[in-house]
């Protein structure tokens, strides 16, 4: 019977999308293990003969990539965006993280936005644990140097300082509603690692001013975005923006929108992979 071990996503999110295989002898491990002892690991691995490991977060957080490389034999397949794991593990397969927390009806509404205006939006957030977090704070602290219209937030009204999390995922829609441009900064900068930070921009017909995935051009059309490496470069590029820069990128914006629909559907992509695995192996 299907087993789900997930450190971040609610296991029900997997269960709800995998009803077709709920009776199959498969265990799914998502960004696992974090803080598990050896006995707990062995017990979880032994529940089913087919074990699938999905890695979404960077190795810097919990060392899960190191664990995957050292223990790849425990898994039938490892799904990851990391070229390091793919190069060092025979059973690793490329599986970009992507994802989105935007509502389907909101994404549909934003397919043809009618109220976009010339401004740059940005949500700094409260975290300070990664290089991308530091860059967000540095840029926010220098926001007065930005000379074009902006809509900058440190945190949103739904942010709970006690837990460090936002309580209403839909509250972020205010970031995308009207802005032509959005500053999107990932937590870390790695090949293959991109998240809702940039996917949400593409889904809302917003041009991302982007720091993060080193090879993002493998997944999206780079002509539909603006990349930077440092705070100074970001401020310089932002201050040189015009409304024309948005309209000139519309062709590539449409292309990236369609690509983003694919990468946003994390659970759908995984469901398709799992169904193929079941069919090919006659599970």
Across the structure, where does each feature detected by a protein language model lie?
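Pol beta-like nucleotidyltransferase catalytic core
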Residues: 1-55, 59, 63-148, 158-283
